[in-house]
């Protein structure tokens, strides 16, 4: 199973390079809201991978804190600072066979492209802080093929309630 999370809403206001852009206040609130809502899913995770971009790392740390995921399960990977999706796929396929449940914090268009290619539900756009959970019937990540989209959860889903 893979839990894919797009980083929360980030700021363009500071004069910093793209990689260093921080989360906006809205992004911080969305990450809190979404991660607390996921507690009910009782996710059991073996590994958490995050892009090393500031906005993805911050989103990941909020989720990990609220979901009580141990810090030693997280790895930063510059290859996930990927917008096309080729590196995302490579990172997933190279995961150890002992990793059954994986959580990834990354970027668009890589995430939307991945969930549409490997899930069974078409999603126009995974929004900032959007979560998509996919399940696969495989023994090794390198054998990745079409899976099942188990869940989509976007910030607007929780705000409209």
What are these regions (language model features)?
Residues 80-96:
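Short phosphate-binding loop-to-helix
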Residues 93-103, 145-156:
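A polyampholytic, Gly/Pro-enriched intrinsically disordered region
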Residues 121-155:
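Domain-level recognition of soluble alpha/beta enzyme cores
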């Amino acid at each position: 199973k893979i839990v894919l999370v797009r980083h929360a809403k980030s700021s363009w206001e500071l004069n910093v390079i793209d990689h260093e852009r921080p989360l906006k206040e809205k992004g911080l609130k969305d990450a809190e809201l979404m991660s607390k809502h996921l507690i009910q899913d009782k996710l059991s995770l073996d590994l958490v991978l995050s892009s090393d971009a500031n906005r993805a790392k911050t989103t990941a740390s909020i989720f990990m804190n609220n979901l009580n995921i141990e810090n030693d399960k997280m790895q930063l990977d510059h290859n996930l600072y990927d917008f096309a999706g080729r590196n995302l796929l490579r990172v997933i396929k190279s995961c150890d066979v002992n990793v059954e449940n994986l959580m990834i914090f990354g970027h668009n268009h890589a995430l939307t492209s991945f969930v549409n290619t490997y899930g069974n539900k078409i999603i126009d756009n995974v929004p900032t802080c959007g979560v998509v959970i996919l399940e696969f019937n495989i023994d090794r990540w390198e054998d990745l093929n079409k899976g099942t989209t188990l869940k989509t959860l976007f910030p607007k889903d929780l705000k409209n309630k």
